[in-house]
C-alpha cells in the first residue's frame, strides 16, 4: 500500500477532488499554507494499493495539465507499513 500526498493551489483543489471521486478514489483534503508567499494550498492524502499509484497520478496529470514550466501539483508517494481502520 502507498500514501500519495498531493499539494495543489486552492483554485485547483475542487477540480482535482471531483476527478478523484469520478475515478473511484477516496481523498482526504487538508487546508494548509506554504511557499514563498504563504499562499493558500490544499494537501490531499490518498491511500492506494501499489497497483493504483499510476492511475492516481494519471488523474492528477489529466485534471491539472502543466502549462510550460508552471507545474500545478507536487506529489509524494510513500510506502505505508501499516493500515488499520477502527
Where are these regions (language model features)?
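Positively charged, small/polar-rich N-terminal and surface patches that mediate targeting and assembly
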Residues: 1-86
Amino acid at each position: 500500500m502507498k500514501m500519495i500526498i498531493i499539494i495543489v493551489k486552492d483554485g485547483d483543489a475542487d477540480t482535482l477532488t471531483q476527478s478523484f471521486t469520478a475515478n473511484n478514489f477516496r481523498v482526504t483534503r487538508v487546508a494548509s499554507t506554504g511557499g514563498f508567499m504563504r499562499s493558500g494550498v490544499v494537501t490531499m492524502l490518498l491511500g492506494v494499493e501499489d497497483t493504483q499509484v499510476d492511475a492516481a497520478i494519471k488523474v492528477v496529470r489529466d485534471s491539472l495539465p502543466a502549462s510550460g514550466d508552471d507545474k500545478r501539483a507536487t506529489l509524494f508517494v510513500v510506502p505505508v507499513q501499516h493500515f488499520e481502520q477502527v
